Amino acid sequence: MEGIQTRKGAEEQGSKGEIASAPLRPRSPASGKKRVLIIGLDCAEPSLVFDKYRAEMPNLQSLISNGAWGEIESTTPPITVPAWMSAMTSKDPGQLGVYGFRNRADYSYEKMFTANSRAITEPAVWDYLGRAGKQSYLVGVPPSFPPKPVNGGMIGCFLSPNAQSKFTYPENLREEILRVAPNYLVDVPNFRTDDKRALLQKIYEMTEDHFKVIKYLVKEKSWDFLMSVEIGVDRLHHGFWKYHDASHPKHEPGNALLNSIHDYYVWLDQQIGGVLELLDDDTRVIVFSDHGAKKMDGGIAINEWLISEGYLVLEEKPQGIVPLEKVRVNWNKTRAWGSGGYYSRVFLNVQGREPNGVIPPADYEKVRDELIAKICAIPDDKGKPIATRVHKPQQIYRATKNIPPDLIVIFGDLYWRAVGSLGLNALHTFENDTGPDDANHAQMGMFVYHDPKRDLGGRELRDLQLYDIAPTVLREFGMDAPGDMIGKAIQVG
Protein backbone atom coordinates (compact mmCIF):
# COMPACT_ATOMS: atom_id res chain seq x y z
CA MET A 1 0.00 0.00 0.00
CA GLU A 2 1.37 3.39 -0.97
CA GLY A 3 0.90 5.02 2.44
CA ILE A 4 2.64 2.25 4.35
CA GLN A 5 5.52 2.21 1.89
CA THR A 6 5.89 5.94 2.38
CA ARG A 7 5.87 5.46 6.12
CA LYS A 8 8.57 2.78 5.96
CA GLY A 9 10.73 5.06 3.89
CA ALA A 10 10.27 7.77 6.48
CA GLU A 11 11.18 5.36 9.27
CA GLU A 12 14.42 4.49 7.51
CA GLN A 13 15.45 8.10 7.01
CA GLY A 14 13.54 10.01 9.68
CA SER A 15 16.23 10.00 12.34
CA LYS A 16 18.70 11.50 9.85
CA GLY A 17 16.32 14.24 8.74
CA GLU A 18 16.86 13.25 5.10
CA ILE A 19 13.28 12.78 3.93
CA ALA A 20 12.93 14.08 0.40
CA SER A 21 10.28 16.79 0.10
CA ALA A 22 8.82 18.23 -3.06
CA PRO A 23 7.58 21.83 -2.97
CA LEU A 24 3.87 22.55 -3.14
CA ARG A 25 2.78 22.13 -6.75
CA PRO A 26 1.21 25.04 -8.63
CA ARG A 27 -2.56 25.23 -8.39
CA SER A 28 -5.05 25.16 -11.20
CA PRO A 29 -6.15 28.48 -12.71
CA ALA A 30 -8.93 30.29 -10.90
CA SER A 31 -12.47 29.22 -11.70
CA GLY A 32 -14.14 32.37 -10.40
CA LYS A 33 -16.11 30.41 -7.80
CA LYS A 34 -15.05 31.30 -4.28
CA ARG A 35 -14.59 28.19 -2.15
CA VAL A 36 -13.23 27.27 1.28
CA LEU A 37 -11.51 24.02 2.20
CA ILE A 38 -10.88 23.13 5.84
CA ILE A 39 -8.53 20.29 6.74
CA GLY A 40 -9.12 19.52 10.39
CA LEU A 41 -6.42 17.60 12.23
CA ASP A 42 -7.79 16.32 15.51
CA CYS A 43 -5.24 16.89 18.30
CA ALA A 44 -2.49 18.26 15.98
CA GLU A 45 0.15 19.79 18.24
CA PRO A 46 1.29 23.31 17.24
CA SER A 47 4.85 22.88 18.51
CA LEU A 48 5.31 20.00 16.06
CA VAL A 49 3.70 21.71 13.06
CA PHE A 50 5.15 25.19 13.59
CA ASP A 51 8.56 24.24 14.94
CA LYS A 52 9.86 20.71 15.37
CA TYR A 53 8.72 19.15 12.07
CA ARG A 54 7.99 22.27 10.03
CA ALA A 55 11.03 22.00 7.75
CA GLU A 56 10.04 18.44 6.80
CA MET A 57 6.42 19.31 6.00
CA PRO A 58 6.76 21.30 2.75
CA ASN A 59 3.06 21.56 1.99
CA LEU A 60 2.06 22.96 5.36
CA GLN A 61 5.26 25.02 5.33
CA SER A 62 4.14 26.62 2.06
CA LEU A 63 0.72 27.45 3.49
CA ILE A 64 2.33 28.90 6.61
CA SER A 65 5.02 30.90 4.82
CA ASN A 66 2.62 32.47 2.32
CA GLY A 67 -0.36 32.69 4.65
CA ALA A 68 -1.06 33.39 8.30
CA TRP A 69 -0.74 31.07 11.25
CA GLY A 70 -0.84 30.82 15.02
CA GLU A 71 -1.93 28.87 18.04
CA ILE A 72 -5.66 28.71 18.66
CA GLU A 73 -7.24 28.26 22.08
CA SER A 74 -9.58 25.32 22.53
CA THR A 75 -12.69 25.03 24.62
CA THR A 76 -12.76 24.25 28.32
CA PRO A 77 -12.43 21.33 28.50
CA PRO A 78 -10.32 20.80 25.35
CA ILE A 79 -12.17 17.69 24.21
CA THR A 80 -13.05 16.59 20.65
CA VAL A 81 -16.74 16.66 21.53
CA PRO A 82 -17.73 19.48 21.85
CA ALA A 83 -14.64 21.37 20.57
CA TRP A 84 -15.23 20.84 16.83
CA MET A 85 -18.84 21.92 17.11
CA SER A 86 -17.88 24.93 19.21
CA ALA A 87 -15.63 25.93 16.32
CA MET A 88 -18.29 25.43 13.67
CA THR A 89 -21.21 27.00 15.59
CA SER A 90 -19.22 29.64 17.50
CA LYS A 91 -20.98 28.56 20.69
CA ASP A 92 -19.36 27.43 23.92
CA PRO A 93 -19.97 23.98 25.47
CA GLY A 94 -22.56 25.39 27.85
CA GLN A 95 -24.51 26.98 25.03
CA LEU A 96 -24.40 23.66 23.18
CA GLY A 97 -25.35 21.79 26.35
CA VAL A 98 -22.55 19.30 25.67
CA TYR A 99 -19.79 19.10 28.28
CA GLY A 100 -17.90 16.11 26.87
CA PHE A 101 -18.64 12.79 25.23
CA ARG A 102 -20.79 11.60 28.14
CA ASN A 103 -23.30 13.88 29.82
CA ARG A 104 -25.99 13.55 32.46
CA ALA A 105 -29.33 12.70 30.88
CA ASP A 106 -31.26 13.63 34.03
CA TYR A 107 -30.65 14.16 37.74
CA SER A 108 -30.63 10.46 38.55
CA TYR A 109 -27.35 8.87 39.56
CA GLU A 110 -27.01 6.49 36.64
CA LYS A 111 -28.44 7.86 33.41
CA MET A 112 -25.89 9.33 31.00
CA PHE A 113 -25.99 9.94 27.25
CA THR A 114 -23.26 10.00 24.63
CA ALA A 115 -23.30 13.23 22.68
CA ASN A 116 -23.92 12.26 19.07
CA SER A 117 -25.05 14.57 16.27
CA ARG A 118 -28.57 14.82 17.71
CA ALA A 119 -27.17 16.51 20.81
CA ILE A 120 -26.14 19.52 18.71
CA THR A 121 -29.13 21.78 18.11
CA GLU A 122 -27.32 25.03 17.30
CA PRO A 123 -26.83 25.82 13.58
CA ALA A 124 -23.36 25.22 12.16
CA VAL A 125 -21.54 27.01 9.35
CA TRP A 126 -22.89 24.62 6.72
CA ASP A 127 -26.45 25.34 7.82
CA TYR A 128 -25.99 29.05 7.17
CA LEU A 129 -24.25 28.33 3.87
CA GLY A 130 -27.04 25.97 2.84
CA ARG A 131 -29.64 28.67 3.43
CA ALA A 132 -27.62 30.86 1.07
CA GLY A 133 -27.73 28.15 -1.59
CA LYS A 134 -24.16 26.98 -1.13
CA GLN A 135 -23.15 23.33 -1.06
CA SER A 136 -21.08 21.78 1.72
CA TYR A 137 -19.40 18.38 1.98
CA LEU A 138 -18.29 17.19 5.40
CA VAL A 139 -16.02 14.27 6.22
CA GLY A 140 -15.80 13.01 9.79
CA VAL A 141 -16.59 16.26 11.62
CA PRO A 142 -17.47 15.21 15.22
CA PRO A 143 -20.15 14.54 16.17
CA SER A 144 -21.72 13.61 12.84
CA PHE A 145 -23.47 10.34 13.49
CA PRO A 146 -26.26 9.89 12.71
CA PRO A 147 -25.55 12.11 9.68
CA LYS A 148 -27.83 15.12 9.33
CA PRO A 149 -29.38 16.49 6.16
CA VAL A 150 -27.15 19.12 4.56
CA ASN A 151 -27.12 20.91 1.23
CA GLY A 152 -24.36 18.70 -0.12
CA GLY A 153 -23.16 15.63 1.74
CA MET A 154 -22.06 14.41 5.15
CA ILE A 155 -19.86 11.43 6.03
CA GLY A 156 -20.11 10.32 9.65
CA CYS A 157 -17.30 10.68 12.17
CA PHE A 158 -15.62 8.12 14.42
CA LEU A 159 -18.84 7.81 16.46
CA SER A 160 -20.36 5.94 13.50
CA PRO A 161 -20.52 2.17 14.13
CA ASN A 162 -18.67 1.41 10.88
CA ALA A 163 -18.78 2.08 7.14
CA GLN A 164 -21.48 -0.57 6.71
CA SER A 165 -23.89 1.52 8.80
CA LYS A 166 -26.02 4.37 7.47
CA PHE A 167 -23.20 6.82 8.09
CA THR A 168 -23.66 9.18 5.14
CA TYR A 169 -26.13 11.78 3.95
CA PRO A 170 -27.49 11.25 1.43
CA GLU A 171 -27.54 7.53 2.06
CA ASN A 172 -26.33 6.68 -1.44
CA LEU A 173 -23.13 8.67 -0.83
CA ARG A 174 -22.00 5.62 1.13
CA GLU A 175 -21.81 3.59 -2.09
CA GLU A 176 -19.53 6.20 -3.64
CA ILE A 177 -17.27 6.24 -0.58
CA LEU A 178 -16.90 2.47 -0.61
CA ARG A 179 -16.08 2.48 -4.32
CA VAL A 180 -13.24 4.90 -3.62
CA ALA A 181 -12.13 3.19 -0.40
CA PRO A 182 -13.65 -0.31 -0.02
CA ASN A 183 -12.09 -0.79 3.44
CA TYR A 184 -12.98 2.68 4.73
CA LEU A 185 -12.62 3.00 8.51
CA VAL A 186 -14.42 5.63 10.56
CA ASP A 187 -11.89 4.99 13.35
CA VAL A 188 -9.19 2.51 14.28
CA PRO A 189 -10.65 -0.49 16.16
CA ASN A 190 -8.89 0.23 19.48
CA PHE A 191 -6.30 2.93 20.00
CA ARG A 192 -5.73 1.91 23.63
CA THR A 193 -3.91 -1.30 22.83
CA ASP A 194 -0.52 -2.88 23.51
CA ASP A 195 -0.26 -4.04 19.89
CA LYS A 196 1.41 -0.85 18.72
CA ARG A 197 2.51 -2.01 15.30
CA ALA A 198 -0.97 -3.16 14.36
CA LEU A 199 -2.35 0.14 15.63
CA LEU A 200 0.15 2.13 13.59
CA GLN A 201 -0.70 0.16 10.46
CA LYS A 202 -4.42 0.81 10.94
CA ILE A 203 -3.88 4.54 11.53
CA TYR A 204 -2.03 4.82 8.23
CA GLU A 205 -4.60 2.76 6.34
CA MET A 206 -7.47 4.78 7.80
CA THR A 207 -5.87 8.16 7.11
CA GLU A 208 -4.94 7.20 3.56
CA ASP A 209 -8.52 6.18 2.82
CA HIS A 210 -9.87 9.39 4.36
CA PHE A 211 -7.67 11.44 2.03
CA LYS A 212 -8.71 9.33 -0.97
CA VAL A 213 -12.29 10.29 -0.18
CA ILE A 214 -11.42 13.96 0.28
CA LYS A 215 -9.71 14.03 -3.11
CA TYR A 216 -12.70 12.29 -4.69
CA LEU A 217 -15.07 14.90 -3.28
CA VAL A 218 -12.82 17.77 -4.36
CA LYS A 219 -12.73 16.47 -7.93
CA GLU A 220 -16.19 14.99 -8.43
CA LYS A 221 -18.61 17.12 -6.43
CA SER A 222 -19.88 20.63 -6.89
CA TRP A 223 -18.98 22.29 -3.60
CA ASP A 224 -18.49 25.66 -2.03
CA PHE A 225 -17.35 24.49 1.40
CA LEU A 226 -15.55 21.23 2.11
CA MET A 227 -14.35 20.21 5.55
CA SER A 228 -12.68 17.06 6.84
CA VAL A 229 -11.43 16.05 10.27
CA GLU A 230 -8.65 13.47 10.50
CA ILE A 231 -8.92 11.52 13.77
CA GLY A 232 -5.72 9.57 13.05
CA VAL A 233 -3.54 12.32 14.55
CA ASP A 234 -5.35 12.00 17.86
CA ARG A 235 -5.09 8.21 17.88
CA LEU A 236 -1.38 8.42 17.07
CA HIS A 237 -0.69 10.77 19.97
CA HIS A 238 -2.54 8.70 22.51
CA GLY A 239 -0.86 5.53 21.32
CA PHE A 240 2.73 6.66 20.76
CA TRP A 241 3.56 9.83 22.72
CA LYS A 242 5.84 8.05 25.19
CA TYR A 243 8.18 6.98 22.38
CA HIS A 244 8.38 10.47 20.94
CA ASP A 245 8.77 12.54 24.13
CA ALA A 246 11.99 12.00 26.08
CA SER A 247 10.45 13.72 29.12
CA HIS A 248 7.56 11.23 29.29
CA PRO A 249 7.73 9.14 32.49
CA LYS A 250 7.33 5.97 30.40
CA HIS A 251 9.75 6.96 27.63
CA GLU A 252 11.66 4.07 26.09
CA PRO A 253 14.96 5.34 24.61
CA GLY A 254 15.96 3.54 21.44
CA ASN A 255 12.55 1.94 20.91
CA ALA A 256 11.86 1.08 17.27
CA LEU A 257 8.77 3.30 17.46
CA LEU A 258 10.80 6.35 18.48
CA ASN A 259 10.02 8.21 15.23
CA SER A 260 6.42 7.04 14.83
CA ILE A 261 4.89 10.48 15.42
CA HIS A 262 7.52 12.27 13.34
CA ASP A 263 7.10 9.89 10.42
CA TYR A 264 3.32 10.14 10.42
CA TYR A 265 3.38 13.95 10.44
CA VAL A 266 5.78 13.99 7.47
CA TRP A 267 3.64 11.44 5.61
CA LEU A 268 0.45 13.33 6.54
CA ASP A 269 1.89 16.45 4.96
CA GLN A 270 2.21 14.49 1.70
CA GLN A 271 -1.46 13.52 1.95
CA ILE A 272 -2.39 17.16 2.46
CA GLY A 273 -0.27 18.08 -0.56
CA GLY A 274 -2.22 15.61 -2.68
CA VAL A 275 -5.40 17.56 -1.87
CA LEU A 276 -3.87 21.01 -2.32
CA GLU A 277 -2.68 20.25 -5.83
CA LEU A 278 -6.30 19.72 -6.90
CA LEU A 279 -7.44 23.19 -5.84
CA ASP A 280 -7.78 26.32 -7.93
CA ASP A 281 -6.71 29.82 -7.00
CA ASP A 282 -10.17 30.78 -5.77
CA THR A 283 -10.06 28.26 -2.93
CA ARG A 284 -8.98 29.49 0.47
CA VAL A 285 -7.52 26.84 2.77
CA ILE A 286 -7.73 26.58 6.54
CA VAL A 287 -5.92 23.88 8.49
CA PHE A 288 -6.58 23.73 12.22
CA SER A 289 -6.83 21.44 15.22
CA ASP A 290 -9.40 21.35 17.99
CA HIS A 291 -6.69 21.09 20.67
CA GLY A 292 -3.07 20.08 21.01
CA ALA A 293 -1.31 17.22 22.79
CA LYS A 294 1.13 16.77 25.65
CA LYS A 295 2.59 13.98 27.73
CA MET A 296 0.53 12.38 30.47
CA ASP A 297 2.39 12.12 33.77
CA GLY A 298 -0.26 10.00 35.46
CA GLY A 299 -3.80 9.87 36.76
CA ILE A 300 -5.55 11.15 39.87
CA ALA A 301 -8.27 8.91 41.23
CA ILE A 302 -10.98 11.48 41.83
CA ASN A 303 -13.48 9.11 43.45
CA GLU A 304 -10.83 7.57 45.72
CA TRP A 305 -10.02 11.11 46.83
CA LEU A 306 -13.70 11.95 47.41
CA ILE A 307 -13.99 8.82 49.56
CA SER A 308 -10.92 9.74 51.59
CA GLU A 309 -12.33 13.23 52.18
CA GLY A 310 -15.74 11.92 53.25
CA TYR A 311 -17.72 13.21 50.27
CA LEU A 312 -18.42 9.80 48.70
CA VAL A 313 -19.64 6.91 50.85
CA LEU A 314 -19.86 3.31 49.62
CA GLU A 315 -21.98 0.43 50.87
CA GLU A 316 -19.20 -2.03 50.08
CA LYS A 317 -15.47 -2.13 49.44
CA PRO A 318 -14.70 -2.81 45.76
CA GLN A 319 -13.16 -6.16 44.91
CA GLY A 320 -10.61 -5.12 42.33
CA ILE A 321 -10.62 -2.09 40.04
CA VAL A 322 -14.17 -1.31 38.93
CA PRO A 323 -16.10 1.71 37.62
CA LEU A 324 -18.22 3.63 40.10
CA GLU A 325 -21.46 2.41 38.52
CA LYS A 326 -20.56 -1.17 39.45
CA VAL A 327 -20.33 -0.33 43.17
CA ARG A 328 -23.20 0.23 45.61
CA VAL A 329 -23.10 3.84 46.81
CA ASN A 330 -24.77 5.08 49.97
CA TRP A 331 -26.46 8.06 48.38
CA ASN A 332 -28.05 9.11 51.66
CA LYS A 333 -24.57 9.94 52.98
CA THR A 334 -22.81 10.94 49.74
CA ARG A 335 -22.28 14.61 48.96
CA ALA A 336 -20.26 14.34 45.74
CA TRP A 337 -19.02 11.88 43.12
CA GLY A 338 -16.89 12.25 40.04
CA SER A 339 -16.14 10.94 36.57
CA GLY A 340 -12.80 10.29 34.93
CA GLY A 341 -11.24 11.09 31.58
CA TYR A 342 -8.76 13.62 30.25
CA TYR A 343 -10.46 15.97 32.71
CA SER A 344 -12.87 15.33 35.57
CA ARG A 345 -16.42 16.33 36.30
CA VAL A 346 -17.68 16.44 39.86
CA PHE A 347 -21.38 16.16 40.64
CA LEU A 348 -23.03 17.22 43.90
CA ASN A 349 -25.90 15.42 45.61
CA VAL A 350 -28.33 18.28 46.24
CA GLN A 351 -31.59 18.16 48.18
CA GLY A 352 -34.59 18.57 45.89
CA ARG A 353 -32.49 17.93 42.79
CA GLU A 354 -31.04 14.42 43.08
CA PRO A 355 -33.29 11.57 44.31
CA ASN A 356 -31.46 11.24 47.64
CA GLY A 357 -29.92 14.69 47.81
CA VAL A 358 -28.16 15.62 51.05
CA ILE A 359 -26.68 19.09 50.41
CA PRO A 360 -29.16 21.84 51.31
CA PRO A 361 -29.53 24.27 48.39
CA ALA A 362 -28.44 27.08 50.71
CA ASP A 363 -25.09 25.31 51.17
CA TYR A 364 -24.53 24.54 47.49
CA GLU A 365 -22.04 27.33 46.76
CA LYS A 366 -20.24 26.78 50.04
CA VAL A 367 -19.68 23.11 49.20
CA ARG A 368 -18.56 23.96 45.67
CA ASP A 369 -16.05 26.51 46.97
CA GLU A 370 -14.80 24.06 49.58
CA LEU A 371 -14.27 21.38 46.95
CA ILE A 372 -12.49 23.81 44.61
CA ALA A 373 -9.99 24.75 47.31
CA LYS A 374 -9.36 21.15 48.31
CA ILE A 375 -9.07 19.75 44.78
CA CYS A 376 -6.68 22.51 43.74
CA ALA A 377 -4.47 21.53 46.67
CA ILE A 378 -4.09 17.88 45.57
CA PRO A 379 -0.34 17.39 44.92
CA ASP A 380 1.46 15.01 42.59
CA ASP A 381 2.81 11.69 43.78
CA LYS A 382 5.90 13.44 45.18
CA GLY A 383 3.91 15.98 47.15
CA LYS A 384 4.51 18.89 44.76
CA PRO A 385 1.78 21.31 43.58
CA ILE A 386 0.46 20.63 40.07
CA ALA A 387 -1.48 23.78 39.08
CA THR A 388 -4.94 22.23 38.93
CA ARG A 389 -7.82 24.41 37.73
CA VAL A 390 -11.40 23.88 38.86
CA HIS A 391 -14.24 25.71 37.13
CA LYS A 392 -17.86 26.41 37.90
CA PRO A 393 -19.63 26.02 34.54
CA GLN A 394 -21.81 29.06 35.21
CA GLN A 395 -18.68 31.22 35.43
CA ILE A 396 -16.98 30.10 32.21
CA TYR A 397 -19.93 29.58 29.85
CA ARG A 398 -22.49 32.07 28.55
CA ALA A 399 -25.27 29.57 29.24
CA THR A 400 -25.54 26.13 30.81
CA LYS A 401 -28.04 24.13 28.79
CA ASN A 402 -29.10 20.62 29.74
CA ILE A 403 -27.39 19.37 32.93
CA PRO A 404 -23.89 20.73 33.46
CA PRO A 405 -21.47 19.14 35.90
CA ASP A 406 -21.21 21.05 39.16
CA LEU A 407 -17.46 21.37 38.74
CA ILE A 408 -15.05 20.87 35.83
CA VAL A 409 -11.58 19.81 36.96
CA ILE A 410 -8.41 20.20 34.87
CA PHE A 411 -5.74 18.32 36.80
CA GLY A 412 -2.15 19.56 36.68
CA ASP A 413 -2.45 21.76 33.59
CA LEU A 414 -3.55 18.63 31.67
CA TYR A 415 -0.38 16.68 32.47
CA TRP A 416 -2.58 14.54 34.71
CA ARG A 417 -5.81 12.82 33.79
CA ALA A 418 -8.74 11.95 36.04
CA VAL A 419 -9.47 8.33 36.93
CA GLY A 420 -13.03 7.56 37.97
CA SER A 421 -12.54 3.89 38.82
CA LEU A 422 -12.55 2.58 42.37
CA GLY A 423 -10.46 -0.13 44.01
CA LEU A 424 -7.13 1.47 43.12
CA ASN A 425 -6.30 1.95 46.81
CA ALA A 426 -4.18 4.95 45.84
CA LEU A 427 -4.68 8.58 44.94
CA HIS A 428 -2.15 8.52 42.08
CA THR A 429 -2.01 5.90 39.37
CA PHE A 430 0.25 5.40 36.38
CA GLU A 431 -1.88 2.84 34.56
CA ASN A 432 -4.87 3.98 32.57
CA ASP A 433 -8.08 2.29 33.71
CA THR A 434 -9.31 2.20 30.10
CA GLY A 435 -6.12 0.87 28.47
CA PRO A 436 -2.68 2.21 27.45
CA ASP A 437 -2.76 5.96 26.75
CA ASP A 438 0.36 8.12 26.65
CA ALA A 439 -0.98 11.62 25.98
CA ASN A 440 -3.44 14.15 27.27
CA HIS A 441 -4.93 17.06 25.39
CA ALA A 442 -3.32 20.49 25.42
CA GLN A 443 -5.29 23.73 25.57
CA MET A 444 -3.78 25.24 22.42
CA GLY A 445 -4.27 23.88 18.92
CA MET A 446 -2.86 25.04 15.59
CA PHE A 447 -4.34 27.29 12.89
CA VAL A 448 -3.17 28.06 9.35
CA TYR A 449 -4.91 30.26 6.76
CA HIS A 450 -3.92 30.51 3.10
CA ASP A 451 -5.38 32.52 0.24
CA PRO A 452 -3.53 31.80 -3.03
CA LYS A 453 -4.35 35.31 -4.27
CA ARG A 454 -2.84 37.06 -1.24
CA ASP A 455 0.70 36.65 0.01
CA LEU A 456 0.38 37.26 3.74
CA GLY A 457 4.08 36.62 4.28
CA GLY A 458 3.78 34.06 7.03
CA ARG A 459 2.14 36.46 9.46
CA GLU A 460 1.87 35.08 12.98
CA LEU A 461 -1.56 35.54 14.54
CA ARG A 462 -2.29 35.82 18.25
CA ASP A 463 -5.25 35.53 20.61
CA LEU A 464 -7.18 33.12 18.40
CA GLN A 465 -10.06 31.03 19.74
CA LEU A 466 -11.93 28.08 18.26
CA TYR A 467 -15.06 30.21 18.36
CA ASP A 468 -13.49 32.42 15.66
CA ILE A 469 -13.59 29.69 13.00
CA ALA A 470 -17.29 29.93 12.06
CA PRO A 471 -17.32 33.74 11.65
CA THR A 472 -14.12 33.48 9.61
CA VAL A 473 -15.63 30.97 7.19
CA LEU A 474 -18.79 33.03 6.77
CA ARG A 475 -16.71 36.14 6.05
CA GLU A 476 -14.92 34.27 3.24
CA PHE A 477 -18.31 33.97 1.56
CA GLY A 478 -19.21 37.60 2.18
CA MET A 479 -21.66 36.71 4.94
CA ASP A 480 -21.95 38.43 8.31
CA ALA A 481 -21.75 36.29 11.43
CA PRO A 482 -25.06 36.05 13.30
CA GLY A 483 -25.15 38.18 16.43
CA ASP A 484 -25.28 35.20 18.77
CA MET A 485 -21.93 33.83 17.58
CA ILE A 486 -19.37 34.50 20.29
CA GLY A 487 -16.27 34.49 18.10
CA LYS A 488 -15.02 37.06 15.64
CA ALA A 489 -13.71 36.71 12.09
CA ILE A 490 -9.94 36.31 12.22
CA GLN A 491 -8.07 39.28 10.75
CA VAL A 492 -5.43 37.49 8.72
CA GLY A 493 -3.83 40.47 7.04
Model segments located where?
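A cross-taxon signal for low-complexity, glycine/charged-rich
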Residues: 1-16, 24-31
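Generic recognition of well-ordered alpha-helical segments
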Residues: 59, 370-377, 446, 468-476
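Low-complexity, glycine/alanine/valine/leucine- and proline-rich hydrophobic stretches
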Residues: 413-460, 466-468
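Secreted, luminal/periplasmic, and some membrane-associated catalytic domains
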Residues: 34, 41, 48, 55, ...
